[in-house]
Amino acid sequence: MNHLVLGYVGLVIGVIVTKKSMVWRVGQVGSVLLMLPATVLVNMNMTISNVSYMMTSDFVSLGLTVLSIWLLPLMLLASQQHMVSESLIYQRVFVGCQVFLTGALVLAFMASDLLLFYIAFESTLLPTLMLITRWGAQKERYQAGTYFMFFTLVGSLPLLICLIGQYQMVGSLALDLSYEGVFQLSYLVNFWWVGCILAFLVKLPLYGVHLWLPKAHVEAPIAGSMVLAGVLLKLGGYGMMRVSLMWGATAMLSSEVFLALALWGIVVMGGICLRQTDLKSLIAYSSVGHMALVVGGVLTGVAWGYNGAMVLMIAHGLVSSCLFCLANLWYERSSTRNLSGSRGLIMIFPLISLGWFLMSLMNMALPPAINLFGELVAMVALYNWSPYSIVYMSLGAVLTAAYSLYLFGMSQWGNTMKNYKNLYTITSREYLLTTLHLVPAIYLIFYLGLMF
């Protein structure tokens, strides 16, 4: 496990010292070499007994670790086209940021101590901020970076305070210990619980603290959007699962408020998506709705809820990352993300429209998509918590189907604008990029046992 993190450190150094013509090749080849042993871990029986002094891997962290490693070569593949014109130093920094960010994510998912997890959690802030503010497309990227930094830091400070307090009371921050019953006063439990999960709710994000996400997605380059939607949001869900498993029922006393916000967020985000005219903005808001169901699954505190949330996070990471790639594919050719100006793509790029079609179906959790299994399991857990929640979940499912069909129909059907008929064709790099998102999403349909 430690060798995997050291591999990313070596890859960052390799990107810095290699000659200009080899920067992207070193990054891509190195990330693929690190990806190969990670995929072998999927077939291993990783339990909580596989714990070293610093690193661990179990059913909670393994899937997200492999997802992070899988997406790195795809981010480099998606970014290569628009980074060719940059100077050598900026290319090195760009590739180095992505490699460092992936290494920090792997360290966060495999940390066996809450302090190490917090350090890795915060280490993702700077490279993500650099990707947004330096390589964003418009001047609003600075505002997006400010929002992202403000929400992240404000949410993370209570977490640090709570971790310090926990260490003073218990003398340990190990993830494999149970801390249930440590607090004797109920108000201290509520205070600690809210302080701990606030950082994770901001990172997910939960409806109400989600304002940074659409801005960051819209202004970020394709690599930033992919890592945000694919993995960074999952840090919040992973952190909530870890904290909940450590403290058990003791830490669930104040979860009703957040569960209510999550259910309301599913409905509201579905309605907002139907009003969007920007491709990236629509996909970003849909992420908030899907992550709200993850919050609901985790905060129910039952095993089914955890399993559903885990499947949802992995499925959403692949689907949303691919949707952002497809949106960027069109943006690089037309310089627009407006839905009304993106009509008739099926007439221009018929094969890529198949990718749009499959990902739209997965986004709405149509059978037999892996998203369906995650959503059903999470919904069962929420229904057991409160039968009234089925009203919000049903309405959210209808709205999700509506905006997914709206996204596909508005972008693929209709009359193509005349100035878009002579666009350059899809390259093999872009076909490969789309395929590498589709293959694991389809593979997991037939091997659900890997995640249950």
Swiss-Prot record:
GO BP term, example: electron transport coupled proton transport
Residue runs in coiled coils: none
Tagged with keyword Translocase: yes
Subcellular compartments: Mitochondrion membrane
Enzyme class: translocase
Principal location class: mitochondrion
Known EC number: 7.1.1.2
Signal peptide region: none
Keywords carried by this UniProt record: Electron transport, Membrane, Mitochondrion, NAD, Respiratory chain, Translocase, Transmembrane, Transmembrane helix, Transport, Ubiquinone
Keyword NAD annotated: yes
Reactions performed catalytically: a ubiquinone + NADH + 5 H(+)(in) = a ubiquinol + NAD(+) + 4 H(+)(out)
Membrane topology listed for this record: Multi-pass membrane protein
Parts of the chain that traverse the membrane: 4-24, 29-49, 59-79, 88-110, 114-136, 144-164, 182-202, 221-241, 252-272, 282-304, 309-331, 345-365, 390-410, 432-452
Entry GO MF terms: NADH dehydrogenase (ubiquinone) activity; ubiquinone binding
One Gene Ontology term, aspect cellular component: mitochondrial membrane
Family: Belongs to the complex I subunit 4 family.
Purpose: Core subunit of the mitochondrial membrane respiratory chain NADH dehydrogenase (Complex I) that is believed to belong to the minimal assembly required for catalysis. Complex I functions in the transfer of electrons from NADH to the respiratory chain. The immediate electron acceptor for the enzyme is believed to be ubiquinone.
Annotated protein name in UniProt: NADH-ubiquinone oxidoreductase chain 4
Gene source species: Branchiostoma lanceolatum (Common lancelet)
Gene name, Swiss-Prot/TrEMBL: ND4
